[in-house]
Amino acid sequence: MITLPARPESLTFAPQQSALIVVDMQNAYASQGGYLDLAGFDVSATRPVIVNINTAVAAARAAGMLIIWFQNGWDDQYVEAGGPGSPNYHKSNALKTMRQRPELQGKLLAKGGWDYQLVDELTPQEGDIVLPKPRYSGFFNTPLDSILRSRGIRHLVFTGIATNVCVESTLRDGFFLEYFGIVLEDATHQAGPAFAQQAALFNIETFFGWVSDVESFCHALSPATPLSLAKEKRYA
């Protein structure tokens, strides 16, 4: 068992009965020229997040935690995205950007394309699980719940992009399904202004889960392990 310092209080759990979830660390969300960048969102601060996720993944893997990687997107014909009868058709900024810029049609969040791929610095390894998801929440239309329940996993540690969209959506759905959700704040990044990150973390800490950081997570798993973290204070 480990005890992880977190807000509003510490949590105690077994690493082998928990999972580290890496949400949507794709070129779409973390790279210049990806969907978020093309849609007008600032992705300039994602490099430290990638470094910190790598650190968290290495610590989790060494401790025997299951690592689950999500990739958000759809088939190259966008059937999975939903047509005009779907709210996703109207609210997805990727779909809206492609309608506004026809030259991008088929390039954003399409399975098999560069935008859909995980960033080069983050590579799943044997024993990890990689799951596609068609909507913001990793629980919707995916086998995530059955994967976790069949392994007796109740504690989920979240990293990835975007904190205020897919990370928070997945953590919230997990809360409703009786999972304990913890987000590592310095291994996440928001889509939008800094207050979106602050608001998401407030919601999680106050209503739906717990907030910790990569250093605390790694020290809890292996107190003697030296860390290599990206130190960048981005939020007041």
UniProtKB/Swiss-Prot annotation:
Recorded name of the encoding gene: rutB
EC category: hydrolase
Keyword Hydrolase: yes
InterPro entries recorded: Isochorismatase-like_dom, Isochorismatase-like_hydrls, Isochorismatase-like_sf, RutB
PANTHER family: ISOCHORISMATASE-LIKE DOMAIN-CONTAINING PROTEIN (PTHR43540:SF6), PEROXYUREIDOACRYLATE/UREIDOACRYLATE AMIDOHYDROLASE-RELATED (PTHR43540)
Organism: Klebsiella pneumoniae (strain 342)
Role summary: Hydrolyzes ureidoacrylate to form aminoacrylate and carbamate. The carbamate hydrolyzes spontaneously, thereby releasing one of the nitrogen atoms of the pyrimidine ring as ammonia and one of its carbon atoms as CO2.
Record-listed E.C. numbers: 3.5.1.110
Annotated protein name in UniProt: Ureidoacrylate amidohydrolase RutB
